[in-house]
Amino acid sequence: MSEISIATSVPSGPGPLIGNQPDGPAKVIVRDLNFYYGQNHALKHINLSLAANRVTAFIGPSGCGKSTLLRVFNRMYDLYPGQRAEGQVMLDGNNILDPKLDLNLLRARVGMVFQKPTPFPMTIYENIAFGIRLYEKISKSEMDGRVEKALRSAALWNEVKDKLNASGLSLSGGQQQRLCIARTIAVRPEVILFDEPCSALDPISTAKIEELIDELKEDYTIAIVTHNMQQAARVSESTAFMYLGELIEFGPTNKIFTSPNDRRTQDYITGRFG
């Protein structure tokens, strides 16, 4: 895809109460996005932008559409029949919903880390090298360097450098999740999607992942879905609150958590429903 300049504003029309937009240029702009599971209208007229090199958190009760939205960003829904998206999702000015789009290239540019760690049943080294080989042919020495760099970026190198030939499944839950992050980083994405990345982890592992996310935003644009309000407040610059497939409110995280404009946002954050 070509790199072209893009506007950073979100168009008017059906949509949420939107506060001040995040500082800096937008990496992703969503325009009047609708998504359907068969006849079920799961996402309704979504408009927002993801700022480059920032963390955007998506919060809301179960079934509100936040994970569905995340899966639109890398066309994961294409793997399942009967699902479709309408509207525009612009990545550096190119609509990723274009049916002619190369999905392998898109998923290299937009990586995803899932709720439960999903290491491949292979060695730690091969977990990282596998994805690189899908897109590039490089020498063994270059591969060694890429594997080390990815593991260092995921704050895992020092823990596994002496056992790279051990199974990825032999690692602890928190280490497995960081291995999955390293695997995502290894193919050099531009955007990383995190879908409840800490829900299966203990508090210590969660703290490591949160610290890692804060470091990763220097190089990547990040979107995270979380049910943990404290986590959203800690890691993100912008927060989107979703309810029943609609984007209710979107703006700076501090504003969303301290003085939201919509009563439903306030009620959810304070635990009155959800």
UniProtKB/Swiss-Prot annotation:
Gene Ontology cellular component terms for the protein in this record: plasma membrane
List of residues binding ATP: 60-67
A single GO BP: phosphate ion transmembrane transport
Protein EC: 7.3.2.1
Chief site of localization: membrane
Keyword vocabulary terms for this entry: ATP-binding, Cell inner membrane, Cell membrane, Membrane, Nucleotide-binding, Phosphate transport, Translocase, Transport
Subcellular location: Cell inner membrane
A GO molecular-function annotation: ATP binding
SUPFAM superfamilies tied to this protein: P-loop containing nucleoside triphosphate hydrolases
Membrane topology, record value: Peripheral membrane protein
Reactions catalysed: phosphate(out) + ATP + H2O = ADP + 2 phosphate(in) + H(+)
Region Disordered, annotated ranges: 1-21
Residues covered by the ABC transporter domain: 28-269
Matching InterPro entries: AAA+_ATPase (IPR003593), ABC_transporter-like_ATP-bd (IPR003439), ABC_transporter-like_CS (IPR017871), P-loop_NTPase (IPR027417), PstB-like (IPR005670)
Compositionally biased residues, Polar residues: 1-11
Protein purpose: Part of the ABC transporter complex PstSACB involved in phosphate import. Responsible for energy coupling to the transport system.
Family indicated by similarity: Belongs to the ABC transporter superfamily. Phosphate importer (TC 3.A.1.7) family.
Description of how the protein assembles with itself and partners: The complex is composed of two ATP-binding proteins (PstB), two transmembrane proteins (PstC and PstA) and a solute-binding protein (PstS).
Name under which the protein is recorded: Phosphate import ATP-binding protein PstB
Organism: Rhodopseudomonas palustris (strain BisB5)
GN (gene name): pstB
